[in-house]
Amino acid sequence: MTDFTIHTIPGSPFARAVMVALEEKALAWRLAPLAPGSLKQQPHLSRHPFGRMPVVEHGDFTLYETQAILRYIDRLAPKPPLTPADPRAAARMDQLMNISDWYLFQGVGNVIAFQRVVGPRVFGVIPDEAVIAACLPKARTVFDEIARLLGDQAFLAGDAFSLADAMVAPQMDFMAQTPEWTALTAAHPNLVAWLARTNARPSLAATTWDLVAELAKKAA
């Protein structure tokens, strides 16, 4: 099968979700690293008119939007399946993928993880404690709900790793690097155990920010 090319800034949790899915399927991929500040410029705008990431190229097929990419990968290479066969479990997977996009990232990860992890590492940002404090109520709601939906299951949509885990784990992995993680997960040992379980998978271990940054250096 033709290799996948992933256009992204190293460290993107959205791109990591794609990498995780490809690793789970044992599909070959290569990194086409983007520089910070290049998303709203050509040639990237010719791939993604909204200037976001990641963008995947597979032969002559170009695709953006992480959820669309993940579902394409799962349909293209159905073994092992990353979508539950049970309709309710599949619906729960879809629900959690959207929670990840609209609530875990928007207003939580893109604030706390940026202020604590990404901003200092990439841009030399000094964390703004007031900005972080303002988003903590939403963060608590998001963590409470994801932990509730996880319950005592091994993974987010049941007993098997799914696209929901591929999406949520990279976001949570950033959050786990912040001091807010301890308080946000204090009442949710199931969430802590789930992240440890997912991070132990070879697909997550092979796609850490540091490893992808090394790939970017080699690709430059």
Where are these regions (language model features)?
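Generic structural signal for individual residues within well-ordered alpha-helical segments
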Residues: 45, 91-94, 167, 192, ...
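GST-like fold's C-terminal all-alpha helical module
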Residues: 100-200
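Short, hydrophobic secondary-structure boundary micro-motifs
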Residues: 80-85, 107-108, 156-159, 184, ...
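GST-like domain detector, emphasizing the conserved glutathione-binding G-site
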Residues: 1-133, 147, 154
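Phosphate-coordinating loops and pocket residues in cytosolic domains that bind phosphorylated ligands
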Residues: 46, 200, 209
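Residue-level recognition of oxygen-bearing side chains
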Residues: 68, 88, 190, 203, ...
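Terminal-tail/helix-coil boundary detector
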Residues: 206-220
